[in-house]
A protein has these predicted regions:
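Active-site-adjacent loops and short helices of periplasmic peptidoglycan-processing enzymes
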Residues: 1-76, 80-82
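Generic detector of well-ordered alpha-helical segments enriched in charged/polar residues
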Residues: 28-32, 47, 57, 104, ...
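Conserved catalytic core of the tyrosine transesterase superfamily
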Residues: 2, 83-87, 221
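Short alpha-helix boundary/capping motifs
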Residues: 62, 74-75, 87-89, 151, ...
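Short, flexible segments with low predicted structural confidence
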Residues: 5-6, 17-18, 31-32, 94-96, ...
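Active-site-proximal helix/loop microenvironment
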Residues: 67-139
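Structured C-terminal helix/loop/strand segments within mature extracytoplasmic catalytic/sensor domains
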Residues: 53, 108, 112-120, 124-166, ...
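Flexible glycine/proline-enriched surface loops and loop-helix/loop-strand junctions
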Residues: 26-30, 37-43, 103-111, 129, ...
Length: 231
């Protein structure tokens, strides 16, 4: 990886440990960073390695997954959020008022953009196929599920899961602007000791709820699922 591969949005272990003009990371390190730690830099590097967004979307279609599409990497999505799409550089003379207006435009543009979208049903369908071994080879399936079991955001669905039930999940979060959070998501596979499995896809969009209420909502979703759908 080169320094210009770094994505300056979100939390990135890769960025934090990067020194000099280039660093070498294994595919396993990038996968762990992207899946378990939601590292945007790692996600973009992996996306480019497999052939870019069209390759990923084609893979989904080839495996019968509709209404899920990947059009851009995290860097491009961050530029849209920041109102920088089409801009090569920000003006050094930008005023606080101009910056606020730019961010507002970017946030509104992201919410209206049809690209890089999925539905809860499509996300659940993806997880079902993954769980059933219909997407990847057996070793790759085991690896991805293990990375999902070790994702590091504890206060969404995982907060409502009792001892003995395992959760392999992936969270997604946008930043918050003026009290609105564009995306606050968690999708996962719950598994009981006897093998009983339930798939959950929970998406919260354009929410004005404070962070503690959003986290409490996802905890409650998991509690209801466990209570009503246990074996």
């Amino acid at each position: 990886m080169r320094r210009d591969d770094l994505v300056r949005s979100g939390v990135s272990q890769i960025t934090a440990t990067f020194h000099g003009d280039q660093e070498v990371f294994t595919i396993r390190q990038l996968l762990e960073a992207a899946v378990s730690h939601s590292d945007n830099t790692a996600a973009d590097v992996l996306l480019n390695l497999v052939g870019g967004p069209p390759t990923v979307t084609a893979f989904l279609r080839d495996h019968g997954i509709r209404n899920m599409r990947v059009d851009r990497g995290e860097r491009e999505i961050a530029r849209e959020f920041q109102g920088r799409s089409g801009l090569h550089a920000l003006s050094s003379e930008e005023t606080p008022q101009q910056k606020d207006a730019r961010l507002q435009r970017g946030y509104a543009a992201y919410l209206k953009d049809p690209r890089d979208r999925t539905t809860p049903d499509a996300a659940a369908h993806f997880l079902k196929k993954l769980w059933q071994g219909q997407l990847l080879s057996p070793p790759s399936t085991r690896l991805l599920l293990d990375l999902l079991y070790h994702q590091t955001i504890p206060d969404r669905l995982l907060a409502g899961i009792p001892p003995g039930v395992r959760l392999a999940d992936k969270c997604g979060t946008s930043y918050t602007l003026d009290g609105m959070t564009a995306a606050f998501n968690d999708i996962g596979i719950l598994t009981w000791p006897d093998g009983h499995t339930v798939i959950v896809a929970a998406f919260l969009t354009a929410s004005h709820a404070p962070d503690e209420r959003r986290r409490a909502l996802f905890k409650r979703i998991a509690q209801v699922v466990v209570s009503d759908l246990h074996p």
